[in-house]
Amino acid sequence: MGIRAIVVDTAGTTTDLNFIQDVLFPYSVKALPDFLEQNQHNVLVENCICDTRDIALEPDADLARVTEILQQWVSEDRKATPLKTLQGLIWKQGYGHGEFKGHIFPDFIEAVKRFSAQNLRIYSFSSGSVDAQKLLFSHSDGGDLTEMFNGHFDTRTGNKLDKQAYCNILNTISLSPKQVLFVSDVIEELKAAEAAGMMTCQMVRDSTQRTGEFRKISSFDELLIE
Protein backbone atom coordinates (compact mmCIF):
# COMPACT_ATOMS: atom_id res chain seq x y z
CA MET A 1 0.00 0.00 0.00
CA GLY A 2 2.79 2.44 0.99
CA ILE A 3 2.84 5.99 2.28
CA ARG A 4 0.85 8.38 0.10
CA ALA A 5 0.65 11.41 2.40
CA ILE A 6 2.75 13.09 5.07
CA VAL A 7 1.20 15.23 7.80
CA VAL A 8 3.68 17.46 9.62
CA ASP A 9 3.47 19.30 12.90
CA THR A 10 4.92 22.81 12.68
CA ALA A 11 6.50 24.17 15.90
CA GLY A 12 9.51 22.05 16.77
CA THR A 13 9.22 19.98 13.59
CA THR A 14 9.26 22.22 10.51
CA THR A 15 9.80 25.44 12.43
CA ASP A 16 12.04 26.43 15.33
CA LEU A 17 9.95 26.70 18.49
CA ASN A 18 11.98 29.78 19.44
CA PHE A 19 10.62 31.61 16.39
CA ILE A 20 7.08 31.00 17.62
CA GLN A 21 7.80 31.89 21.25
CA ASP A 22 10.29 34.72 20.81
CA VAL A 23 9.02 36.43 17.65
CA LEU A 24 5.42 35.60 16.77
CA PHE A 25 3.84 35.40 20.23
CA PRO A 26 5.36 38.66 21.58
CA TYR A 27 4.42 40.43 18.34
CA SER A 28 0.78 39.39 18.73
CA VAL A 29 0.67 40.43 22.41
CA LYS A 30 2.01 43.89 21.60
CA ALA A 31 -0.28 44.36 18.60
CA LEU A 32 -3.52 43.06 20.13
CA PRO A 33 -4.81 46.28 21.80
CA ASP A 34 -4.54 48.48 18.71
CA PHE A 35 -5.63 45.70 16.37
CA LEU A 36 -8.84 45.01 18.31
CA GLU A 37 -9.57 48.72 18.71
CA GLN A 38 -9.18 49.36 14.99
CA ASN A 39 -10.93 46.21 13.75
CA GLN A 40 -13.59 45.50 16.38
CA HIS A 41 -16.41 46.04 13.87
CA ASN A 42 -14.94 43.65 11.30
CA VAL A 43 -17.26 40.62 11.27
CA LEU A 44 -14.51 38.04 11.76
CA VAL A 45 -12.86 40.02 14.56
CA GLU A 46 -16.23 40.71 16.18
CA ASN A 47 -16.98 36.98 16.18
CA CYS A 48 -13.60 36.28 17.81
CA ILE A 49 -14.35 38.85 20.50
CA CYS A 50 -17.74 37.24 21.19
CA ASP A 51 -16.20 33.75 21.27
CA THR A 52 -13.55 34.96 23.72
CA ARG A 53 -16.26 36.26 26.06
CA ASP A 54 -18.08 32.93 25.79
CA ILE A 55 -15.02 30.79 26.49
CA ALA A 56 -13.95 33.02 29.40
CA LEU A 57 -17.53 33.02 30.78
CA GLU A 58 -17.44 36.82 30.83
CA PRO A 59 -20.34 37.87 28.55
CA ASP A 60 -20.12 41.52 29.61
CA ALA A 61 -16.36 41.93 29.20
CA ASP A 62 -15.48 45.20 27.49
CA LEU A 63 -12.82 45.44 24.79
CA ALA A 64 -10.04 46.18 27.28
CA ARG A 65 -10.97 43.11 29.31
CA VAL A 66 -11.18 40.93 26.18
CA THR A 67 -7.69 42.13 25.27
CA GLU A 68 -6.42 41.15 28.73
CA ILE A 69 -7.98 37.70 28.42
CA LEU A 70 -6.41 37.12 25.02
CA GLN A 71 -2.99 38.29 26.19
CA GLN A 72 -3.24 35.98 29.19
CA TRP A 73 -4.09 33.10 26.87
CA VAL A 74 -0.95 33.83 24.86
CA SER A 75 1.16 33.62 28.02
CA GLU A 76 -0.53 30.30 28.87
CA ASP A 77 -0.10 29.02 25.29
CA ARG A 78 -3.86 28.43 25.25
CA LYS A 79 -5.04 26.72 22.06
CA ALA A 80 -8.28 28.72 21.84
CA THR A 81 -9.64 29.14 18.31
CA PRO A 82 -10.54 32.87 18.61
CA LEU A 83 -7.01 33.64 19.83
CA LYS A 84 -5.41 31.63 17.04
CA THR A 85 -7.63 33.32 14.45
CA LEU A 86 -6.72 36.79 15.73
CA GLN A 87 -3.03 35.92 15.88
CA GLY A 88 -3.20 34.84 12.25
CA LEU A 89 -4.72 38.18 11.26
CA ILE A 90 -2.12 40.11 13.24
CA TRP A 91 0.78 38.09 11.85
CA LYS A 92 -0.53 38.70 8.34
CA GLN A 93 0.16 42.39 8.91
CA GLY A 94 3.64 41.67 10.27
CA TYR A 95 4.57 39.42 7.37
CA GLY A 96 3.08 41.90 4.91
CA HIS A 97 5.11 44.76 6.36
CA GLY A 98 8.28 42.68 6.20
CA GLU A 99 8.78 42.77 9.96
CA PHE A 100 9.79 39.10 9.99
CA LYS A 101 9.99 36.01 7.77
CA GLY A 102 8.67 32.58 8.66
CA HIS A 103 11.42 30.36 9.99
CA ILE A 104 11.54 26.94 8.31
CA PHE A 105 14.30 24.43 9.00
CA PRO A 106 16.45 24.06 5.84
CA ASP A 107 16.09 20.27 5.89
CA PHE A 108 12.31 20.61 5.61
CA ILE A 109 12.59 23.07 2.73
CA GLU A 110 14.55 20.48 0.77
CA ALA A 111 12.34 17.61 1.91
CA VAL A 112 9.06 19.24 0.93
CA LYS A 113 10.45 19.71 -2.58
CA ARG A 114 11.51 16.07 -2.65
CA PHE A 115 8.14 14.83 -1.38
CA SER A 116 6.31 16.97 -3.91
CA ALA A 117 8.45 15.57 -6.74
CA GLN A 118 7.49 12.08 -5.54
CA ASN A 119 3.81 13.02 -5.82
CA LEU A 120 3.34 12.56 -2.09
CA ARG A 121 0.59 14.63 -0.57
CA ILE A 122 1.79 17.05 2.11
CA TYR A 123 -0.34 18.51 4.89
CA SER A 124 0.40 20.51 8.02
CA PHE A 125 -1.45 20.20 11.34
CA SER A 126 -0.95 22.96 13.88
CA SER A 127 -2.70 24.62 16.78
CA GLY A 128 -2.06 27.82 14.83
CA SER A 129 -4.83 28.76 12.42
CA VAL A 130 -4.81 27.58 8.82
CA ASP A 131 -4.25 31.19 7.77
CA ALA A 132 -1.25 31.45 10.12
CA GLN A 133 0.21 28.26 8.64
CA LYS A 134 -0.21 29.57 5.11
CA LEU A 135 1.53 32.79 6.12
CA LEU A 136 4.40 30.87 7.70
CA PHE A 137 5.01 28.79 4.59
CA SER A 138 4.34 31.54 2.03
CA HIS A 139 6.64 34.10 3.71
CA SER A 140 9.32 31.62 4.75
CA ASP A 141 13.05 32.24 4.66
CA GLY A 142 13.09 29.53 1.99
CA GLY A 143 10.59 31.30 -0.22
CA ASP A 144 6.94 30.49 -0.91
CA LEU A 145 6.38 26.79 -0.18
CA THR A 146 2.57 26.80 -0.20
CA GLU A 147 2.14 25.33 -3.68
CA MET A 148 3.75 22.12 -2.43
CA PHE A 149 1.13 21.61 0.26
CA ASN A 150 -2.17 19.85 -0.35
CA GLY A 151 -3.84 21.32 2.72
CA HIS A 152 -3.61 22.51 6.30
CA PHE A 153 -5.44 21.60 9.51
CA ASP A 154 -5.91 23.54 12.75
CA THR A 155 -7.95 23.46 15.98
CA ARG A 156 -11.18 23.33 13.99
CA THR A 157 -10.17 19.78 13.05
CA GLY A 158 -9.71 18.87 16.70
CA ASN A 159 -7.27 18.90 19.59
CA LYS A 160 -3.85 17.63 18.52
CA LEU A 161 -3.74 15.39 21.58
CA ASP A 162 -7.00 13.63 20.70
CA LYS A 163 -7.34 10.57 18.48
CA GLN A 164 -10.48 12.00 16.89
CA ALA A 165 -8.55 14.88 15.31
CA TYR A 166 -6.46 12.42 13.32
CA CYS A 167 -9.54 10.40 12.38
CA ASN A 168 -11.02 13.65 11.08
CA ILE A 169 -7.91 14.28 8.98
CA LEU A 170 -8.11 10.78 7.52
CA ASN A 171 -11.76 11.30 6.63
CA THR A 172 -10.95 14.62 4.97
CA ILE A 173 -8.08 13.37 2.83
CA SER A 174 -9.77 10.02 2.07
CA LEU A 175 -6.78 7.79 2.72
CA SER A 176 -6.43 4.73 4.92
CA PRO A 177 -4.44 5.21 8.16
CA LYS A 178 -1.45 3.15 6.99
CA GLN A 179 -1.08 5.39 3.93
CA VAL A 180 -0.47 8.45 6.12
CA LEU A 181 2.69 9.31 8.05
CA PHE A 182 2.48 11.86 10.86
CA VAL A 183 5.71 13.60 11.92
CA SER A 184 5.89 15.54 15.18
CA ASP A 185 8.28 16.27 18.03
CA VAL A 186 5.51 15.88 20.64
CA ILE A 187 5.06 12.39 22.06
CA GLU A 188 1.42 12.90 23.07
CA GLU A 189 0.53 13.93 19.52
CA LEU A 190 2.25 10.86 18.11
CA LYS A 191 0.31 8.65 20.51
CA ALA A 192 -2.98 10.20 19.39
CA ALA A 193 -2.10 9.75 15.70
CA GLU A 194 -1.02 6.17 16.33
CA ALA A 195 -4.32 5.48 18.11
CA ALA A 196 -6.07 6.61 14.91
CA GLY A 197 -3.99 4.07 12.99
CA MET A 198 -1.53 6.45 11.32
CA MET A 199 2.12 5.68 10.79
CA THR A 200 4.26 7.89 13.01
CA CYS A 201 7.76 9.32 13.26
CA GLN A 202 9.23 11.51 16.00
CA MET A 203 11.30 14.52 15.01
CA VAL A 204 14.06 14.81 17.61
CA ARG A 205 15.64 18.23 17.44
CA ASP A 206 17.83 19.57 20.26
CA SER A 207 15.13 20.28 22.85
CA THR A 208 12.82 17.37 22.02
CA GLN A 209 11.71 14.92 24.69
CA ARG A 210 12.99 11.50 23.67
CA THR A 211 11.13 8.21 23.94
CA GLY A 212 11.77 4.65 22.84
CA GLU A 213 8.24 4.21 21.53
CA PHE A 214 8.56 5.80 18.10
CA ARG A 215 10.87 5.79 15.11
CA LYS A 216 13.11 8.87 15.40
CA ILE A 217 14.77 11.24 12.97
CA SER A 218 16.77 14.38 13.73
CA SER A 219 16.31 15.86 10.26
CA PHE A 220 13.93 15.44 7.34
CA ASP A 221 17.02 14.41 5.37
CA GLU A 222 16.64 11.05 7.13
CA LEU A 223 13.01 10.61 6.09
CA LEU A 224 13.15 8.68 2.84
CA ILE A 225 9.85 7.48 1.40
CA GLU A 226 10.07 4.71 -1.17
Curated annotation (Swiss-Prot):
- How does the annotation summarize its subunit structure? Monomer.
How far does the signal peptide extend, from start to end residue?
none
Q: Does the keyword Nucleotidyltransferase apply?
A: no
As cofactor, the record names: Mg(2+)
Q: Which Gene3D superfamilies did the record assign? A: 1.10.720.60, HAD superfamily/HAD-like (3.40.50.1000)
Keyword Magnesium on entry: yes
- Designated gene of the protein: mtnC
Family per similarity comment: Belongs to the HAD-like hydrolase superfamily. MasA/MtnC family.
Which reaction(s) does its UniProt entry say it catalyses?
5-methylsulfanyl-2,3-dioxopentyl phosphate + H2O = 1,2-dihydroxy-5-(methylsulfanyl)pent-1-en-3-one + phosphate
Reported EC number(s) for this entry are 3.1.3.77
Pathway assignment: Amino-acid biosynthesis; L-methionine biosynthesis via salvage pathway; L-methionine from S-methyl-5-thio-alpha-D-ribose 1-phosphate: step 3/6; Amino-acid biosynthesis; L-methionine biosynthesis via salvage pathway; L-methionine from S-methyl-5-thio-alpha-D-ribose 1-phosphate: step 4/6
Q: Which GO terms describe its molecular function?
A: 2,3-diketo-5-methylthiopentyl-1-phosphate enolase activity; 2-hydroxy-3-keto-5-methylthiopentenyl-1-phosphate phosphatase activity; acireductone synthase activity; magnesium ion binding
**Record keywords, A-Z:** Amino-acid biosynthesis, Hydrolase, Magnesium, Metal-binding, Methionine biosynthesis
> Its Gene Ontology biological processes?
L-methionine salvage from methylthioadenosine
The record describes the protein's role as: Bifunctional enzyme that catalyzes the enolization of 2,3-diketo-5-methylthiopentyl-1-phosphate (DK-MTP-1-P) into the intermediate 2-hydroxy-3-keto-5-methylthiopentenyl-1-phosphate (HK-MTPenyl-1-P), which is then dephosphorylated to form the acireductone 1,2-dihydroxy-3-keto-5-methylthiopentene (DHK-MTPene).
Q: Please give the organism.
A: Shewanella baltica (strain OS185)
Cofactor binding note from Swiss-Prot or TrEMBL: Binds 1 Mg(2+) ion per subunit.
**What is the protein's given name?**
Enolase-phosphatase E1
Q: Which InterPro entries match?
A: Enolase-ppase_E1 (IPR023943), HAD-like_sf (IPR036412), HAD-SF_hydro_IA (IPR006439), HAD_sf (IPR023214)
